[in-house]
């Protein structure tokens, strides 16, 4: 592959038409070094200004050498260079999350509107095969995208249509860990695909074609249903079950961090098909709100006091949570306060999926309790949960206290006192 071939493709796709400040993710391997040299050579022709971002994972003896080389190269070529060092227990996922968080922060702080990575066609084939192996649903078989939203801008992969063997063998650092079998992707790259390619030399090409066709299928479906207000319950339920299935899949693409499993997806679909009212936690700080007319998935904002985090109340101390002041003292006055153990801290938090409270000889899920008490759906997320030793002691909601039942008062040596700051 000549760089001129890539240049022609990049210009045809207009990858950088709306971008000037470009951040390049460079590991030091042959792929990213080719990307760096390509964009460095053609930055004037592409009318862009480039910078380099590198993460030192500290996993190999030559990691520091790579960082120093890239730093010096960037300095000699008058290119901004940003680096970060991964700390903590290493895993592929943790390292990836660290890298992309670092890239997002650099983009935001220094005004870069595009992150460029060196993923190529072999990476695409490996990704599709990996997802097939893991039993991923159809929409995940669309594979890696050439362009996607990322941070405050876009993530662009200009090499994605080109194979690794087409890249020039320029100076680079070899990563010995890519040859090991510790990671599934390495086993796919080094063993599974080579063996299967002996049966069909065009296997990688077919995997990529399947990914492209799957992507076209979803695009066609989106185009055909784009005029539907799918959050309108009447419109959603008027569709066939097959269309409902893919409408919901398309809707969930708006929430990439939600990551629902197949079982969770099926349950979500069942709720939309059968429930008139629903308001409950899904996962990863997302909630589903539904009434007879509309539904929506919403994310809890970190700035919202209503959803403040967990607090620990130690014996002999006091904390503020929401509109209440909680104090944990010795049970000297048996007529006041709520009896609790004095040898376990008290946890004050918001509701979690599956929460239960003991009511005598049985336990009841909070969701069922709220239904039985006819508490409106929109109020249920206001509940404050107080627990001790993994048991819910009480629930505070809308000025009403729901106490557990069936515990032995005589073994409770402490008292929990609650004061409403608004009274």
Curated annotation (Swiss-Prot):
Quick one: which residues bind ATP?
27-32
GO MF? ATP binding; tRNA(Ile)-lysidine synthase activity
Write the signal peptide boundaries.
none
Which BP terms in the Gene Ontology apply to this protein?
A: tRNA modification
- Entry's EC annotation: 6.3.4.19
Enzyme category, top tier:
ligase
Which Pfam families does the entry link to?
ATP_bind_3, TilS_C
Its localization reads: Cytoplasm
The reply on keyword Iron is no
UniProt-listed Gene3D superfamilies = HUPs
The UniProt keywords, alphabetically, are:
ATP-binding, Cytoplasm, Ligase, Nucleotide-binding, tRNA processing
Catalytic activity reads: cytidine(34) in tRNA(Ile2) + L-lysine + ATP = lysidine(34) in tRNA(Ile2) + AMP + diphosphate + H(+)
Which GO cellular component terms are attached?
cytoplasm
Q: Which CDD domains match?
A: TilS_N (cd01992)
Supply the domain comment.
The N-terminal region contains the highly conserved SGGXDS motif, predicted to be a P-loop motif involved in ATP binding.
Q: Which family does it belong to?
A: Belongs to the tRNA(Ile)-lysidine synthase family.
**Functional description taken from the UniProt entry:** Ligates lysine onto the cytidine present at position 34 of the AUA codon-specific tRNA(Ile) that contains the anticodon CAU, in an ATP-dependent manner. Cytidine is converted to lysidine, thus changing the amino acid specificity of the tRNA from methionine to isoleucine.
The name under which this protein is listed is tRNA(Ile)-lysidine synthase
UniProt source species: Streptococcus mutans serotype c (strain ATCC 700610 / UA159)
Record lineage:
Bacteria, Bacillati, Bacillota, Bacilli, Lactobacillales
């Amino acid at each position: 592959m000549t760089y001129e071939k890539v240049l022609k493709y990049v210009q045809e796709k207009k990858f950088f038409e709306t971008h000037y400040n470009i951040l390049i993710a460079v590991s030091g391997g042959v792929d990213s070094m080719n990307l760096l040299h390509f964009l460095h050579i053609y930055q004037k022709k592409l009318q862009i200004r480039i910078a380099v971002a590198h993460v030192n994972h500290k996993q190999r003896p030559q990691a520091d050498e790579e960082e120093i080389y890239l730093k010096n190269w960037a300095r000699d070529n008058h290119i901004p260079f940003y680096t970060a060092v991964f700390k903590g227990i290493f895993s592929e996922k943790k390292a990836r999350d660290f890298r992309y968080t670092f890239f997002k922060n650099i983009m935001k702080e220094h005004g870069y509107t595009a992150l460029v990575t060196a993923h190529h066609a072999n990476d695409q084939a490996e990704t599709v095969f990996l997802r097939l192996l893991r039993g991923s649903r159809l929409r995940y078989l669309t594979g890696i995208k050439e362009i996607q939203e990322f941070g405050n801008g876009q993530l662009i992969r200009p090499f994605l249509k080109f194979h690794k063997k087409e890249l020039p063998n320029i100076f680079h650092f070899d990563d010995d860990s890519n040859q090991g079998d510790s990671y599934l992707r390495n086993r796919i790259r080094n063993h599974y695909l080579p063996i299967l390619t002996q049966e069909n030399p065009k296997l990688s090409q077919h995997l990529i074609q399947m990914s492209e066709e799957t992507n076209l299928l979803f695009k066609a479906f989106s185009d055909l249903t784009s005029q539907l207000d799918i959050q309108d319950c009447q419109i959603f339920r008027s569709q066939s079950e097959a269309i409902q299935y893919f409408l919901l899949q398309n809707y969930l693409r708006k929430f990439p961090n939600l990551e629902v499993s197949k079982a969770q997806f099926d349950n979500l679909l069942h709720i939309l098909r059968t429930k008139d009212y629903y308001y409950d936690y899904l996962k990863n700080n997302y909630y589903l709100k539904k009434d007879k007319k509309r539904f929506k998935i919403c994310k809890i904002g970190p700035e919202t006091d209503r959803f403040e985090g967990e607090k620990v109340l130690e014996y002999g101390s006091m904390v503020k949570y929401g509109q209440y002041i909680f104090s944990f003292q010795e049970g000297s006055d048996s007529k006041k306060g709520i009896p609790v153990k004095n040898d376990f801290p008290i946890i004050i938090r918001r509701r979690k999926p599956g929460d239960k409270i003991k009511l005598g000889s049985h336990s009841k899920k909070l969701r069922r309790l709220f239904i039985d008490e006819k508490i409106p759906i929109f109020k249920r997320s206001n509940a404050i949960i107080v627990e001790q030793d993994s048991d819910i002691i009480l629930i505070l909601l809308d000025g009403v206290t729901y106490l557990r039942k069936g515990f032995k008062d005589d073994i409770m040596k402490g008292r929990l006192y609650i004061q409403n700051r608004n009274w």
